Amino acid sequence: MNDPIAREPGQRDWSEFCDRADRFLENTAQYVHLGVNPGDYYTSIWTRDAAYILRDQFLTGDTSNVLQCLYFIWAYQIDLNNQKIVYGRGSPELNFRIQHADSRTKEKFMGALPSTIYQQEGISEVYGRNPDIDSTALMVSTTSWILDTYLKAGLYSYCDDLKSAPNPLSFADYIKQTPNLSKDVRQSSILNQQSMPLLSRVLLKPAELIEFIVPRMVVAIHYLASRDIDNDGLLEQGYNEDWMDTALRAGKIVYDQASWILAANDFSSLLCEIGEENMASRLTRMAERTVNAVEEKLWSEEDGAYIDIKYDGVDGKNEEERMLTQDVSLYLVAITENSLNDNLSIRFKGRNNSHNVNDRCQSFRHNFDNNSSRRVTHKTIEERAARTLETIKTRIWKDGARPLITEKELKRTGPWILDSNQYHNHTFWPWITGIEMLARSRFQRYGECNDLLSELTRENYSQTLAYYEWVNPVTGKGSGAFPFRTGISTIRMALTDTLLSRYS
């Protein structure tokens, strides 16, 4: 690949990175379109995993199948219909026992997406005591980003053809009618032959798809906002209600805030595109409030990084030990996200020259920049991001460029009692390393991106480490699902973002 910026410092790192990235993208293309399940023995749909896989599929141009999958997943949003939902298998408060959700529980969960959709069995599972924040937030983010990109690319003009959509339902009406409406558009198991005609019409008329999904994402946002239990701007999760679902992590988790910021920012951009400026503006303010809260409460000057505030026990007391985790890197991705609305982005401030950006969206960004409630400047956040990346490298990277998901071994795990260097206990996970690589690229740390990609694709192993679910850092042996398409797609997404942003 010829580099038009060849005279910049770090040319060799960048050139090597481009070569490795090109090879990885070419070698992994065969895995992109094998479904939205994570792969191997994971035959069902994990919502958080699907969020990354669908982005990768959309980037390769598989628009039709991606839109079908979005419809399918949002048809499983939790409400008061007859859908079978189980929960609690990962909750210590429920003794790690499966519970069947009754109408009262469904009402509590309403708006969230399940952790897993077992489509063949006709059952959805919420793994913890409550729906995990990241599954719902990441799918809101991905869905919004795909539809927003679809519209802004001129593939379809929403506003021009909206009148042709059959009886579009307003947001307020949908919220009032959610339980009854869902019985009409959704089944308790997989989409059957009766629902397929609607799906076909959705793909022929994208306005119908948008009118089906967007109101559901509004309800999802209401659910996510309700997870800020003490109204301090930070969402709280219970035990095992995130991707590390054996680590017994609960509290105000940086990774959750990042997922929520991504959801709010990307959905705001989509709403802006379809003319819902007021709601878009509210979402922007909500995202900004969370950024301010993260900077105020989750930044540790002593650690030089963003650190979770974890709860110890069911009484809600904070754990004394503060542990750095690799997934805080998602926060750095969230605050540098290059949506065309660009409400929160540090990296692209004042540099987005796209002619597709509406004047109203530009005004949102102007208001965000000049909002007197901002407590921390962009410059300070940039400095903190750089310190966080350096701290991760110092405290989490082992044996060169092999970052572990936690800086220490976990004191307790459950329901799976993990040995040291097993699964979520102090191990190397390619998928979250892809997120860290993306975060480093956002701050032009291309040499470190090259180091990480080199480790993921080293040839002195029987199989490329990037293809495994997780890796034992002591033995260097890959384990779990293989090939693990969540990891492959996340790395591909990071590489594509890095290459496109560098050359744009």
Map each language-model feature to its residues:
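N-terminal amphipathic/hydrophobic targeting modules at extreme N-termini
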Residues: 182-183, 363
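Hydrophobic alpha-helical bundle architecture
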Residues: 420-423, 437-442, 446-450
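Extended glycan-interaction surfaces of carbohydrate-active proteins
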Residues: 3-45, 79-130, 164, 226-251, ...
